[in-house]
Regions:
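Short acidic capping loops at alpha-helix termini that bridge into adjacent secondary structure
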Residues: 94-100, 120-123, 170
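Active-site phosphate-binding strand-loop segment of PLP-dependent enzymes
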Residues: 146, 151-187
Length: 187
């Protein structure tokens, strides 16, 4: 019996993930030419001095013997509690430990949240420059990304007129879907 050839979903037609695609290929070429490349594309924060809080490290050690099975679907309680405490230190109101969900990295959580929040043809306003996974996740969830400008000359703050020009009936709602994650951390 001959197996049917698998073909990729049309959902991938407009998905480009530059972190592992053309930008990475160009960076490798530059590296081969002798350029020094700092690799920030895969998300290994430890390589750049960002370490897990000691409370989380100790909780992982303490729970290692329980790690052979599934955890609570929201993640281990202790790290969720630590995250809740962090939000309290930052004066972020009304965050309870049950509001915190931990995943296997930001990629999983971005895709999961877009699938949970978007209906087909919902438009999502995304800052430009952006973390490419936002655009890919919106597209895979059936939404349509609309990029608004964050200009270096303006200290990377969003261009409010550009945002206003991008508001349409597809993204105008009681809760406008606006992604404010910005690699420049100006927010």
């Amino acid at each position: 019996m001959k197996l049917a050839q698998l073909k990729k979903s049309s959902k991938l037609n407009n998905v480009c993930y530059d972190i592992r695609g053309p930008v990475l290929a160009h960076a490798k070429k530059m590296e081969e030419e002798g350029h020094r490349i700092i690799k920030l594309n895969i998300g290994n924060p430890a390589a750049f001095g960002f370490e897990a809080p000691e409370e989380i490290v100790q909780d992982v050690i303490r729970n290692m013997s329980k790690a052979s099975g599934y955890t609570d679907s929201k993640g281990l309680f202790e790290p969720r509690k630590s995250i809740m405490h962090y939000t309290q230190e930052k004066n972020i109101p009304n965050v309870d430990v049950d509001d915190v969900i931990i995943g296997n990295g930001v990629s999983e959580l971005i895709v999961m949240s877009m699938q949970a929040l978007l209906d087909n043809d919902d438009e999502v306003l995304i800052p430009m420059p952006d973390y490419p996974l936002w655009t890919a996740a919106v597209t895979l969830a059936g939404g349509r990304p609309r990029h608004y400008l964050c200009d270096e000359v303006s200290n990377w703050y969003p261009d409010l007129k550009d945002i206003e020009s991008k508001i349409t009936e597809q993204n105008k709602s009681d809760c406008c879907k606006l992604i404010q994650i910005n690699p420049t951390r100006c927010f």
